Structures are given as structure tokens and as C-alpha cells.
């Protein structure tokens, strides 16, 4: 029995990196063929099997190397073309895969960098008094603890060391020349130097301003490929966005001048539109509808006909001009996104061409049938077909051989990525119990594994979830009524916790932990089940010794979270299946854009702390005259990072946002503070949120079309329909997002290809 290759590398990104090498990590390559190569396809079956792609690329024969490269291309690992053509391919790839396996460390360090922003003591505290930030009630501060200066320096020092390793490790497999060709690497080194200088200045001579919070966010964007692609896409559409903003500004200037002149001698002009600057300010807020109809109440009292002016303004500004802006910027966004996807496809194609060249060692320009079958057999160590017979491999070969001459050219070979996305699924590592075949493959174990994988087991779990839901409803109702019977139902919920642990154990036993962990639903169930089970066990075992656990409220929230598993019931209902599947796919595709919004909030939060930090405090006489005081918004301030992020979220959803803008203008005594809030609106709301809304709409329609195609395939009794049905079943989340993007951008990608030709 051939041993399956175990995929131990860190999970790679979805799409390969752009041709200009905008990547988090790079690999290296050459056209070496290894010492175990064979002729046209014979002799390869006796080759040594390798557990990792890195070992296969470094030591394997040419089919093993090519299979590893094809698997990298399908996983979306971006290897720069210059590295692929390097003569130190095998050696460099060993370092490259070590870097990938350390991805958990690099990711954890990025998380630590952002977390530091939330834990740092605000810089304004040192300007007031040594213990200013200890008076949390006085300054309406958040509840997160602050690090001392020494603790912050130690924290920053550790993250800086790991960041240095992350940035300079690629030198081991790229080499100095290729490393410095990459613009992103140059920018990383520059920002790293600035960050180190900022830490030194903070250590020996603290200043009221630091650049470190902004650099941390910049590293987050540059090191996460999806965020970097979004940032590059947004930068590419800046010119178009500025053009439509200029058009909007002209409309606003003209409408404000018209309003100022029209209502000059009326109560509206005397109380609200007292000057052109004030009129412009109020009309801008009306453009966002945040002060509608408050701003034109005086005019409406004087004459009902005056409402026509404001109605026309709102209709033109909000429902025409804003949507026009959205249409223009989204069209530009799709064009820029198509460029990123096209460049990623080119990089993926270059990796496939490298794999083709490794197999075609004699330079014939094509692969014969035996060579393709040898490659597919090696590739099956990374990806799994439902059947691994030679007949299945020949079907794949027939799909590759589009010309029907039993020769696969480089162009035909490039379609292998699409074939893999349809025919193959990731091969999970074998279960550890495979080491004991006499037990694991006994008749009883085989029956148990078959039962756990059957629909009947799934129906039983759903029934248990429904019973658990009833128990939670009864227990919470009794808790509200302070009934003594609540204790009994808490014990019933404890029994349900044991049932879920048994369910989890049976699934891991039947599937193996690797296959179990590949499902996102199983990850959610695993974490939630163990958290609830451990919490409930400690609560019952030590009800009085652990004061935190004695409060069962937090467990109740987790129990309610467990009920989210009932969404699987919706997947059993045909009319809901497409909507639920579309929702989860959209969530995956939206994460990079939501990440950009989060990074924008982080940057503005750091800026807000350094501009407005410390000016909202109890006893400030100016504060009592502001809308923050009258609306009881004092907790929503920029005195520390957590409070600032919550405040910016309120501004993001446009909930009475002019209250903060006007209040901070009064507190600072300067109209320049308005720039902060207006720019935040233009970037976060008018640009980013509108893009997200438009993206969701188009992605939803595209995904629904794909789901309908999938349902049609299920009804197709032909061989082609059965093959497509199988493809629907084995698609991974990354593949589904990739298919969704290509479907959405099909017109743009076709146009780009035609221009290239």
C-alpha cells in the first residue's frame, strides 16, 4: 500500500502573488531533475516516498518535484519567477518551507503588535500627571489594563526581534539580489528601521508623538497577502475616486451658496445659515442625512414651500450623486481587482510551466500519456480522488489532452490547476490509529466508523441539539423566575455537554483528527464543546472555590453559542441551502475588506488619541456645553485605544456622528479638527463601506448562479453531471472564493486577456 504524503506545511494563501513579487514570503527554484529520474514514465514506482513537499522538491525525482510544484500552484503559494529559474532551487526550497512552517509564529507576532496598541498607556497621560491614567472614572477610560513603560519596552523588544527574523529570513532562500529587487522588502526594512528608532527614542527621551502605532498597522497590511492585495487595489483607484469627489465638492459648494443666498433674510439664515462657512458645514452634514430634518426646521416653520429646496437637495445628493459615486468607484475597483487576480493567475501559470519543464527534461515540448499518469500518481499523495485507479487517471489525462493527439502541451498542462480544483481534494494526514491496523480495521471499528459517517448519525446529532435547545429555554426561563427547579436543568445541560464530547470523540476516531480539523464547522464545535465542558465541570466540581466560575452566566452565553450549530438544519432544507452556503462563502471573501476597514480604524484611532486624548474629563467646563455631555456620550471618547475604537465604530455606522465632530470642535476651539472627521467619513464610509455593500450584492448574485449550476449538476444523470457533482462536494473554502472571484470578474479578465493578445 502506497504511503500517503502528510501535508504539514502551514496553510498557504488562496491565490499566488503578483508578478512584481508583492508577497509575504518567497520560494526559489531551478530546473534540476534530481538523481532518481526515469525515462518516459517507467521506474518511478520504486522511488522513495517523501512526507513533505519540501523534501520532494529537494530530494525527489522529477515527477515528485513536479507534483509538489503543482500542489503549490493549486494552494496559491506564490514563488517569484526569478527564484523558479535559480540554479539553487532544491536548497532554497528547504529554507522556503521552513519559513512557511513558521507562519504561526509570524502571525502570532502580528497579532501581538496590534494588541500592543490596546495595552499601551496613552501618551497624553505623561503630559498631565504621572498618575492621570490611573483615574479611570475621571477620564472615562476603558477597562483594559495598561502596561508600564518597562513592560511596554520588553514587549516591543520581543516583537521587534521576531519581526527582524520574519523580514530577513527570506534572504536564506532568495539571496540578497532578489531580496532587494522586491519593493515590499525595501519598504519593510525602512519601516523596521523607523520602528527601531522610535522605540529607542521612547526608551530614553519620551515624546508626545510616536509613529510606532501606525507602523504596526502597516506591517499587518504588508504581511497578510489578502490585506496587501486590497490595499494595492484601493491605491490603484485613488485617481478615479478623487475625480468623483471633486464633482461632489462642486455640487456641495454650489448648493451651499444657493442655500446661503436663498435663506439670507429668513429665520433659517439668521439661526442656522449665518455665514457661508456655516452653511457649507451644515449642508455637508445634510448630505449624509445625519441632521435631517433638524437643520431645516426653522425654514419649514416660516414657509412650507421651503421644504422643496431641501427635498430636492437630499434626492440629488443622497439618491443620485452618492449612488453615482458608488457606481464609478466600484467599476474602478473591479478593474483593479481584475489586475490583481490576473497577475496571480500568471504567477500560478509560471509555477505550472516550471513543473512542466521538470518533467519534459528532453525539451520535446509535450508530455506523453505515461508521464502524465506518473505525475498524477505522485500528485495523489497530496490530493485525493474518490478512486485512485489507473482508469481515473486516464480520465484526467483525457481532460488534459484537449487536442486528442495523446500529447499534452504546455498550454494544455496549464489547465491542470482547474482540473485539480474540480477533481481533487486536499489529502488529510492519516489517523494515528492507523499504526494499530488490527484494532482500527477490525469489524467492530469499521462498523462504528461507517455509522458515524452515515446520515443517521447526523440526524441523531441534530435531534440532540433540538433537545438541548428546549433544555436551554426551560433553564433560562426558570432562572428569570428564580425557580429552584433551575438546578435540575443545569445538570441536564451538563449531561448534554458529555454527549457532545462523545460525539466529537467518535468523529475524530472515525475520520482522524486531520480530516476532522479540515472542516470549519468541526473547528467551531471542538473549541466550543471543550470550553463549555471544562467550564461546566469546574463549576460543578468547585462551586465555591472559584468565584469566577461560580457565576454561570458566561456558560449560558456559550450554551446559546452552541445553538449556532443548528444552522446545519438549514443545510438540510433545499430552499435554504443555497442562502446558507452563499453566506459562508461571502464571509470568507469579505474578510480582507473588513480587515482593511479595521486597519483604517486603527490608524484613525492612533491619530485621535494623539489629537484629542485627555480633553474629555469630568469637571471640564467646556465639556458640559457639548452634545457629548447632553447625549451622555462621555464614554465614547479618544482618551485610550479601546474607547477610541468603539467611538470610531459609532462614526462608521453614522449614528449621530455630527455630535462628536461638533463637540470636539468646541473642545479644541479649532475648526481644523473637522478635517479628522470629514476625512474619516470620505475614506471609511463613502469609499470602503460602499465598496463592501456593492461587493456583497454582486458576489451574492454570482454565488447564487454558481449554486444553481451546482443544483443542476446534481439533477444531471450523465457522467459529466456526476463529475461536476463530485466537484461541488470536494471544493474547499479557498477554492470556492477563487471560483467566485473569477465568476464575478469574468468580463474584466476576458478583456484583460484580449488586450494582452
UniProtKB/Swiss-Prot annotation:
In what tissue types does this protein appear? Answer: Expressed in shoot, mature leaf, cultured cells, and at lower level in roots.
Q: Which Pfam families does its entry note? A: Ion_trans
What's its membrane topology?
Multi-pass membrane protein
Task: Identify the stretch(es) annotated as Disordered.
Answer: 24-48
One GO cellular component this record assigns the protein to is: monoatomic ion channel complex
PROSITE patterns the record matches: EF_HAND_2 (PS50222)
Q: Which keywords appear in this protein's UniProt record, sorted alphabetically?
A: Calcium, Calcium channel, Calcium transport, Glycoprotein, Ion channel, Ion transport, Membrane, Plant defense, Repeat, Transmembrane, Transmembrane helix, Transport, Voltage-gated channel
Q: Which GO terms describe its molecular function?
A: calcium ion binding; voltage-gated calcium channel activity
Q: What does this protein do?
A: May function as one of the major voltage-gated Ca(2+) channel (VDCC) across the plasma membrane. May be involved in the regulation of cytosolic Ca(2+) and in growth and development. Acts as the major ROS-responsive Ca(2+) channel and is the possible target of Al-dependent inhibition. Determines sensitivity to T.viride xylanase elicitor. Plays a regulatory role in elicitor-induced defense responses and hypersensitive cell death.
The family note in this entry says: Belongs to the calcium channel alpha-1 subunit (TC 1.A.1.11) family. Two pore calcium channel subfamily.
Summary of subunit composition and partner proteins: Homodimer.
Name recorded for this polypeptide = Two pore calcium channel protein 1
Annotated source species: Oryza sativa subsp. japonica (Rice)
Per the record, the gene is TPC1
Amino acid at each position: 500500500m502506497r504511503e500517503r504524503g502528510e501535508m504539514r506545511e502551514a496553510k498557504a494563501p488562496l491565490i499566488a502573488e503578483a508578478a512584481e513579487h508583492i508577497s509575504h514570503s518567497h520560494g526559489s527554484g531551478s530546473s534540476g531533475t534530481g538523481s532518481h529520474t526515469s525515462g518516459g514514465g517507467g521506474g518511478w514506482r520504486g522511488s522513495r516516498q517523501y512526507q513533505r513537499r519540501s523534501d520532494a522538491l529537494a530530494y525527489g525525482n522529477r515527477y515528485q518535484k513536479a507534483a509538489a510544484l503543482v500542489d503549490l500552484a493549486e494552494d496559491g503559494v506564490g514563488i517569484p519567477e526569478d527564484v523558479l529559474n535559480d540554479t539553487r532551487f532544491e536548497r532554497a526550497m528547504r529554507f522556503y518551507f521552513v519559513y512557511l512552517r513558521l507562519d504561526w509564529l509570524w502571525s502570532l507576532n502580528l497579532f501581538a503588535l496590534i494588541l500592543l496598541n490596546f495595552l499601551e498607556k496613552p501618551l497624553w497621560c505623561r503630559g498631565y500627571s504621572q498618575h492621570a491614567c490611573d483615574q479611570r472614572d475621571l477620564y472615562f477610560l476603558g477597562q483594559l489594563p495598561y502596561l508600564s513603560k518597562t513592560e511596554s519596552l520588553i514587549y516591543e523588544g520581543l516583537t521587534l526581534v521576531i519581526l527582524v527574523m520574519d523580514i530577513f529570513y527570506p534572504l536564506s532562500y532568495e539571496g540578497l539580489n532578489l531580496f532587494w529587487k522586491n519593493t515590499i522588502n525595501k519598504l519593510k526594512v525602512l519601516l523596521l528601521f523607523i520602528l527601531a528608532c522610535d522605540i529607542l527614542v521612547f526608551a530614553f527621551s519620551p515624546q508626545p508623538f510616536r509613529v510606532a502605532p501606525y507602523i504596526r498597522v502597516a506591517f499587518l497590511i504588508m504581511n497578510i497577502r489578502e490585506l496587501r492585495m486590497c490595499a494595492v487595489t484601493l491605491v490603484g483607484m485613488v485617481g478615479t475616486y478623487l475625480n468623483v469627489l471633486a464633482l461632489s465638492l462642486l455640487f456641495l459648494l454650489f448648493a451651499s451658496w444657493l442655500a446661503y443666498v436663498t435663506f439670507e433674510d429668513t429665520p433659517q439664515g439668521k439661526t442656522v445659515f449665518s455665514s457661508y462657512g456655516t452653511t457649507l458645514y451644515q449642508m455637508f452634514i445634510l448630505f449624509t442625512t445625519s441632521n435631517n430634518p433638524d437643520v431645516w426646521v426653522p425654514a419649514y416653520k416660516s414657509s412650507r414651500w421651503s421644504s422643496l429646496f431641501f427635498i430636492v437637495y437630499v434626492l440629488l445628493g443622497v439618491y443620485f450623486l452618492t449612488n453615482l459615486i458608488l457606481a464609478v468607484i466600484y467599476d474602478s475597483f473591479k478593474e483593479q481587482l481584475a489586475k490583481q487576480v490576473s497577475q496571480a493567475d500568471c504567477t500560478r501559470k509560471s509555477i505550472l510551466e516550471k513543473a512542466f519543464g521538470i518533467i519534459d527534461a528532453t525539451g520535446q515540448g509535450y508530455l506523453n500519456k505515461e508521464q502524465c499518469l506518473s505525475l498524477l500518481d505522485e500528485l495523489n499523495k497530496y490530493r485525493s480522488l474518490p478512486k485512485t485507479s489507473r482508469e481515473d487517471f486516464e480520465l484526467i489525462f483525457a481532460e488534459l489532452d484537449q487536442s486528442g493527439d495523446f500529447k499534452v502541451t504546455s498550454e494544455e498542462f496549464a489547465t491542470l490547476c482547474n482540473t485539480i480544483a474540480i477533481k481533487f481534494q486536499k489529502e488529510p494526514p492519516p489517523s494515528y490509529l492507523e499504526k494499530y491496523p488490527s484494532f482500527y480495521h477490525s469489524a467492530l471499528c469499521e462498523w462504528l466508523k461507517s455509522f458515524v459517517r452515515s446520515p443517521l448519525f447526523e440526524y441523531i446529532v441534530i435531534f440532540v441539539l433540538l433537545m438541548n435547545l428546549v433544555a436551554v429555554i426551560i433553564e433560562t426561563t426558570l432562572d428569570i423566575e428564580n425557580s429552584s427547579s433551575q438546578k435540575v436543568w443545569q445538570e441536564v445541560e451538563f449531561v448534554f455537554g458529555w454527549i457532545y464530547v462523545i460525539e466529537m470523540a467518535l468523529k475524530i476516531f472515525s475520520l482522524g483528527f486531520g480530516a476532522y480539523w479540515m472542516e470549519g464547522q468541526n473547528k467551531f464545535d471542538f473549541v466550543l464543546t471543550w470550553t463549555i465542558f471544562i467550564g461546566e465541570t469546574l463549576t460543578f466540581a468547585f462551586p465555591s472555590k472559584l468565584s469566577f466560575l461560580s457565576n454561570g452566566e458566561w456558560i449560558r452565553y456559550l450554551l446559546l453559542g452552541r445553538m449556532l450549530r443548528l444552522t446545519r438544519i438549514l443545510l438540510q432544507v433545499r430552499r435554504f441551502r443555497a442562502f446558507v452556503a452563499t453566506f459562508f462563502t461571502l464571509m470568507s471573501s469579505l474578510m480582507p475588506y473588513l480587515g482593511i476597514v479595521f486597519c483604517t480604524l486603527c490608524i484613525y484611532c492612533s491619530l485621535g488619541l494623539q489629537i484629542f486624548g485627555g480633553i474629555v474629563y469630568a469637571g471640564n467646563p467646556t465639556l458640559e456645553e457639548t452634545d457629548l455631555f447632553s447625549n451622555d456620550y462621555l464614554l465614547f471618547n479618544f482618551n485610550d485605544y479601546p474607547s477610541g475604537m468603539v467611538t470610531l465604530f459609532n462614526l462608521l455606522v453614522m449614528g449621530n456622528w455630527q455630535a462628536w465632530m461638533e463637540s470636539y470642535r468646541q473642545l479644541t476651539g479649532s475648526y481644523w479638527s473637522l478635517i479628522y472627521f470629514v476625512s474619516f467619513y470620505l475614506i471609511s464610509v463613502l469609499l470602503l463601506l460602499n465598496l463592501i455593500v456593492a461587493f456583497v450584492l454582486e458576489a451574492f448574485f454570482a454565488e447564487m448562479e454558481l449554486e444553481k449550476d451546482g443544483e443542476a449538476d446534481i439533477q444531471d444523470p450523465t457522467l459529466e453531471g456526476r463529475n461536476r457533482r463530485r466537484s461541488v462536494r470536494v471544493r474547499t473554502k479557498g477554492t470556492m472564493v477563487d471560483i467566485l472571484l473569477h465568476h464575478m470578474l469574468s468580463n474584466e479578465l476576458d478583456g484583460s486577456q484580449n488586450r494582452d493578445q
